[in-house]
Amino acid sequence: MSTTQKTDFSAMSRLSADIDLNAEGKAHGFVRVPHSVHRSAYGWIPIPIVRIKNGDGPNVLMQAGNHGDEWEGQIGLGNLIRALRPEDIRGRLVILPSANFPAAMEGRRTSPIDEGNLNRS
């Protein structure tokens, strides 16, 4: 599967990713979170995702940015993403550097869409 094809999570949820989470190597993309608005029932919110995979091994998820105004973790994971190469790991590392991307883009603690706080959901 190329990086332009989507990973389909439809059997489990309505989320989709535009990178193959099972492929070897390093890829950057977005998880698409469905979101309806008045102008379109088919909108989505992009959540940045990075996959680094090298052979068999443990699966690790790293996440930051539950609160958009807490930059330390987001910056730290951004630095890690730039520094890590597939040959540096064994297994699969999935990174969500800005889990609440709309809040991060606004520099706000909660989502500007619905005032939601991911730590209180």
Regions found by a protein language model. Give the residues of each.
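Structured catalytic-domain cores with a bias toward divalent-metal coordination
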Residues: 1-121
